[in-house]
């Protein structure tokens, strides 16, 4: 509140000098009003942005309804880990794919890797594959992880986070089973279990390519 020297009449008295709130400052002017509105809009946008930045659960919702949504980011080509060239989900169309997001610093990823390796050995002759995708990991650390666990399934490097956000991935590990038609039929957010993967693969392998 701003104050200024002014004169006011008191009951039964004349005008007496004193420091009183300035009337000119008691009512906001047009500029202050505009600034206030702008600030309110900015706060609203920030709140909306925080809400929207959360994980995308639309894929989970569709899979829970057995809608078999199209696998996101099929055209995204990522560099292979430990070998030259790139690979995309589109290049694997017609195969059942177990898409697994992982990192060397992720303890649950280390625990579930043997499950994925056993699945890979089972899938080799069935036109299917496990496909790992590293998430926020150094290539050297990822390569060491693969060597230590003797993993034979291929992995790609999502260094620029081109694929993971399309699946709503913000925590590891996460696994998506994709059928021959390129549609997601099962999702595991968190450490994978062998019974879950076995059931999901049996369903995907038994399904049609359409």
What are these regions (language model features)?
Residues 3-5:
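Short, positively charged low-complexity motifs
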Residues 13-75, 79, 210:
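N-terminal targeting signals for export/organelle localization
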Residues 32, 144-152, 157-210:
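Thiol/disulfide oxidoreductase modules built on the thioredoxin-like
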Residues 70, 75-97:
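A short beta-strand-turn-helix
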Residues 87-110, 116:
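Short active-site neighborhood of thiol/selenol oxidoreductases, capturing the structured segment around
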Residues 98-100, 132, 177:
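Hydrophobic beta-strand core positions in alpha/beta domains
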Residues 110-149, 159-166:
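Structural microenvironment flanking redox-active thiols in thiol-disulfide oxidoreductases
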């Amino acid at each position: 509140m701003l104050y200024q020297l002014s004169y006011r009449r008191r009951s039964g008295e004349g005008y007496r000098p004193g420091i009183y709130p300035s009337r000119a400052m008691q009512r906001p002017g047009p500029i202050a009003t505009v600034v206030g509105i702008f600030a309110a809009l900015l706060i609203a946008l920030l709140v909306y942005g925080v809400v929207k930045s959360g994980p995308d659960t639309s894929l989970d919702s569709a899979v829970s309804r057995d809608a078999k949504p199209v696998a996101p980011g099929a055209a995204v080509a990522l560099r292979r880990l430990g070998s030259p060239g790139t690979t995309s989900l589109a290049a694997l169309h017609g195969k059942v794919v177990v898409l697994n997001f992982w990192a060397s610093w992720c303890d649950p990823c280390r625990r579930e890797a043997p499950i994925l390796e056993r699945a890979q050995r089972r899938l080799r002759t069935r036109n299917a594959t496990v496909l790992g995708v590293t998430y926020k990991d150094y290539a050297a650390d990822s390569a060491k992880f693969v060597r230590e666990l003797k993993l034979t399934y291929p992995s790609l490097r999502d260094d620029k986070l081109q694929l993971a956000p399309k699946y709503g991935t913000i925590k590891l590990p996460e696994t998506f089973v994709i059928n021959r038609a390129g549609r997601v039929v099962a999702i595991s957010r968190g450490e994978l279990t062998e019974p879950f993967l076995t059931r999901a693969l049996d369903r995907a392998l038994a399904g049609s390519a359409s």
